[in-house]
């Protein structure tokens, strides 16, 4: 957490001179990725990061955390968006479905589009298969 803080603050200092040229740096949103959903240590680190950046103008730690679940590497391997790979939370798992996480993250970054994100279906549309008889379709 300290290394992230040091590096982030150094980056902000490095780009500060651009303000004199009229270039205002955009707000920085920090995403906590690959969070183990039931780890007490992960929760402590998350809270420490939030506390470290709480008073800094232009830096915000996002409230949405991306959990360390198998759906993300599986989606990457298949070349698909994760919300199409895991649209329902598996039974017995603490972490939310990837679709719910992506909706929360997108809504946090672009709150004016939250209703549109809520309408995104997780399941990809199924093409009509009219070449095979109905009895052979799956």
For the regions a language model picked out, list residue spans one by one.
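Conserved catalytic-core segment of NTP-binding enzymes
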Residues: 1-62
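C-terminal boundary of histidine-terminating zinc-finger modules
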Residues: 71-106
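Short, hydrophobic alpha-helical segments
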Residues: 106-120
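Long, low-complexity, intrinsically disordered segments
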Residues: 130-138
